[in-house]
Amino acid sequence: MTPTNPRTPASATASVPVRTPVHLDLRQDVALLTAALIDINSVSGNEGVLADAVEHALRQVPQLELVRDGDSIIARTNLGRPERVILAGHLDTVPLPTTEGSLGTVPAYWPSGAPGEGILYGRGATDMKGGVAVQLALAATMFDGGAEPGKDVTFVFYDHEEVEAEKSGLGRLVRNHGSLLGGDFAILLEPTDGTVEGGCNGTSRFEVTTNGEAAHSARAWMGSNAIHAAAPILARLAAYEPQTVTVDGLDYRESLNAVKIHGGTAGNVIPDRCVVEINYRFAPDKTPDGAEAVVRELLDGFDVVRTDSAAGARPGLNHPAAASFVAAVGAEPKPKYGWTDVARFSELGIPAVNFGPGDALLAHKDNEHVEADAIRECLRALRTWLSA
């Protein structure tokens, strides 16, 4: 008798093919496990095969309580420890490179010719299958030899991180299973080159519109140029001196920039409308409303509309769990200037940091790669800290 996929309604088994999970050996060397994860193509929207493999492998760990929602998975210990730590990572990658000869693709590639040695190439090697491999290795081995972690741990694996926020698997888990995501401290295993990056800046986008009056450009005095009217907007932005704000001991550098400008309809028509698009990266001591107030004050007198916004995240490095983690890693923490999913944990009142193997500058590159030893060192650091 053909086994029934537990995620498929019984009435549908006759018409829906059963998907046998790919076997993942979570106890193999973590760099080899990373290569195995790379070999499972999981571009955003196609995480199902990898999610099946992760779920199947984690169900072999009897100490973990598992919940699956779509292609996102929560796996929790329930040891009654006074502290709970969240280790989170996304399963999806950006699309495969299209440039001929690119090494950052699927399957994984070891230029050394010796799997497990040197540099590992492949899509997601840096962002962030190395980090996911560390999560899985920890989940599978932290009870070995009768040992138990000194903290309760919640492992979170989620889909759709590399696309628009409304599709985020982590956002869906927060909405559907928020009670399972409580914790004292969260670590997002995004690539940081083995350095703790605390919190993240927030980001807001604005449109500033100027209006004029259309006319033939040969008789420009009959109209009013909306693009020219936008000149003071650009001048104020150019003259603005971004702040560097210290939050919980980390210096977050802000930026406020025009990122796009469009206006006009033809080469012989005075433009009657111009829109300047602005991006403000603001320190995590500000709310999105506070950031908007800064922009409105700077551009007083102009029509300013906020089109998108995401709050930043305070690093929370003064929390005992965060402080002990930084001490265990032994590296000076740095601020995160870009926005990451640590902000989602911050919204839940959970201090969070970024910490994972790989150089973030290599993420999404045609030749994306990671050092095998960097993955092993990340695993060692987290294992040491969790066992304390």
Predicted features along the sequence, with ranges:
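N-terminal helical capping/dimerization or prosegment-like subdomains
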Residues: 2-97, 273-279, 294-297, 372-376, ...
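Acidic/histidine-rich catalytic neighborhood of metal-dependent amide-processing enzymes
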Residues: 128, 132-201, 248
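Hydrophobic anchor at the start of a short beta-strand
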Residues: 66, 73, 153, 302, ...
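Metal-dependent amide/peptide-bond hydrolase catalytic core
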Residues: 2-5, 16-18, 25, 191, ...
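Short beta-strand segments
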Residues: 88-89, 156-158, 186-190, 209-211, ...
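Short, internal active-site loops enriched in acidic
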Residues: 72, 159-163, 263-264
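Short coil/turn connectors at secondary-structure junctions
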Residues: 81-83, 115-117, 149-153, 180-184, ...
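Active-site metal-coordination/substrate-binding segment of hydrolases
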Residues: 84-154, 169, 366
